[in-house]
């Protein structure tokens, strides 16, 4: 019916508000009360918005393709808008999958692509458990770089991590200064949302084109994503 988009919008927005009010806010408060900080990948199902990242101490993303919409820039944009100097990203999860194929240079390249998107802390994926009795090269998770002492290049891991440490530290010292804001059509996503696909983040992959992002980058500009919540909060 003609009213269906409005009904879907109200339903999706209610889900988003419940995620903010009943999940993100109380867990962040609990973490602070217990002397720690809540790090969260604030996307997926049900549908948090970009500004939902403001409710956690440490937003985290994933996705190395800096010329596309990614959860990485989703998280870093919110961190810039809401003054959070530490924003992390899950890295190397699918790097030359299966395991053992990635080299230290491969790891550096992917890390740099996250730094380009505004990340200031890397969460390496991963270090799978391997029992002592397992034959070499031990157990490995199918989807990740193997960051453990079964890897033949493990001896140079300190050199890799020192580079990543220095870059992460330096990126936290400055102030983000992107010239372009790309408005995320979250309201349109709400109006089209259905129970089997209730994710704002997934919807943005379809609504924010690679061509748009490429145009901005090729013109020499940096950018952040924004949403209605960030504008209302005065972050833009």
List the model feature ranges, each with a label:
Residues 1-236:
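Carbohydrate-binding surfaces of carbohydrate-active enzymes
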């Amino acid at each position: 019916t003609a009213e269906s988009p409005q009904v879907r919008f109200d339903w999706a927005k209610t889900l988003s508000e419940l995620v903010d009010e009943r999940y993100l806010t109380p867990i962040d408060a609990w973490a602070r009360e217990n002397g720690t900080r809540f790090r969260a990948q604030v996307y997926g199902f049900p549908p948090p918005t970009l500004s939902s990242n403001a409710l956690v101490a440490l937003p985290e993303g994933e996705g190395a393709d800096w010329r596309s919409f990614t959860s990485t820039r989703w998280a870093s944009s919110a961190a810039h808008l809401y003054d959070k100097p530490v924003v992390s990203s899950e890295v190397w999860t699918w790097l030359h999958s299966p395991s053992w194929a990635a080299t230290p240079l491969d790891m550096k390249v992917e890390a740099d692509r996250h730094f380009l998107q505004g990340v200031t802390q890397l969460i390496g994926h991963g270090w799978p458990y391997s029992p002592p009795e397992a034959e070499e090269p031990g157990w490995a998770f199918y989807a990740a770089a193997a960051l453990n002492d079964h890897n033949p290049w493990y001896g140079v891991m300190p050199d890799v991590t020192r580079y990543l440490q220095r870059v992460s530290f330096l990126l936290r010292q400055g102030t983000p200064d992107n010239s372009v804001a790309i408005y995320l059509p979250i309201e349109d996503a709400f109006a089209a949302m259905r129970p089997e696909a209730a994710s704002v983040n997934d919807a943005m992959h379809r609504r924010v084109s690679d061509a748009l992002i490429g145009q901005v980058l090729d013109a020499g500009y940096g950018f952040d994503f924004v949403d209605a919540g960030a504008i209302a909060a005065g972050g833009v």
